[in-house]
Regions:
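Extreme N-terminal, non-catalytic leader segments
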Residues: 1-25
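Walker A (P-loop) phosphate-binding loop of P-loop NTPases
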Residues: 32
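Conserved lysine of the Walker
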Residues: 35
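Hydrophobic positions on the alpha1 helix immediately C-terminal to the Walker A/P-loop
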Residues: 38
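Short beta-strand-centered segment that lines the nucleotide-binding/catalytic pocket of NTP-utilizing
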Residues: 46-61
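Conserved nucleotide-sensing/catalytic segment adjacent to the nucleotide-binding pocket
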Residues: 49, 62-105, 117
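Small-molecule kinase domains that catalyze NTP-dependent phosphoryl transfer to phosphate-bearing small molecules
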Residues: 105, 109, 127, 157-194
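ATP-dependent NMP and nucleoside kinases share a basic, alpha-helical "lid"
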Residues: 105-154
Length: 194
């Protein structure tokens, strides 16, 4: 991730902080575009809290055919709203149990202290049912070849097949159907390991 990207976003956050607190920032975008990396850079730059949408994937009993056929339906956005966005928007502390995809279970609670800025990062962060709660929405994109290269490096070649055949098509359906890039205030293309 190019540090100037994080610096541009941090500058916009500082502008928003002049008008209101707390400021909630969403970072959405394509798989392997650098959403988590950018969130961590913002944590270092401005000391913000970070919540990962990966912690809100559906539990097995929630994965109905109807739900999974809905754009953005494979994330528990209702729980993300109730347990994270609503409390943070009121300046309250957050406590939620992240879902672990490998264990297929909820883990021990994660606590996020209320702060001036919190970043919610991950695919589906800008779902239409959530986007009104953000003060700043950022979209990251990456070219397909680079995306697949990053996924192979991060998750291994076998997992990359599942990403290519299952997760990327679901994300692309969500991005197109929900107008995710268009709803965002800032858009960045990442490349060459940035």
């Amino acid at each position: 991730m190019d540090l100037t990207t994080a610096e541009q976003i941090e500058s916009e956050i500082q502008r928003l902080l002049q008008a209101k607190r707390p400021v909630l920032v969403a970072i959405d975008g394509r798989c392997a575009a650098g959403k988590t990396t950018l969130a961590e850079e913002l944590r270092e730059l401005c000391g913000c809290g970070v919540v990962h949408m990966d912690h809100f994937f559906l539990q097995p009993h929630q994965r109905t055919e109807e739900r999974l056929n809905t754009p953005g339906g494979n994330v528990d956005r209702e729980r993300a709203l109730q347990e994270v966005l609503l409390p943070l928007s009121r300046g309250e502390a957050v406590s939620y149990r992240p879902y672990d995809c490998k264990l297929q279970a909820l883990k021990e609670a994660v606590h996020v202290a209320p702060g001036a800025v919190t970043v919610i990062e991950g695919a589906y962060a800008c779902h239409p049912s959530l986007r009104e709660y953000y003060d700043l929405k950022v979209f990251l994109t990456v070219e397909r070849e680079e995306q697949l290269r990053r996924i192979r490096r991060r998750n291994g070649p076998e997992a990359a097949i599942q990403f290519r055949e299952r997760w990327i098509p679901l994300e692309e359906q969500y991005i197109a159907a929900c107008g995710v890039s268009d709803c965002c205030d800032l858009r960045f293309e990442t490349h060459d390991g940035k």
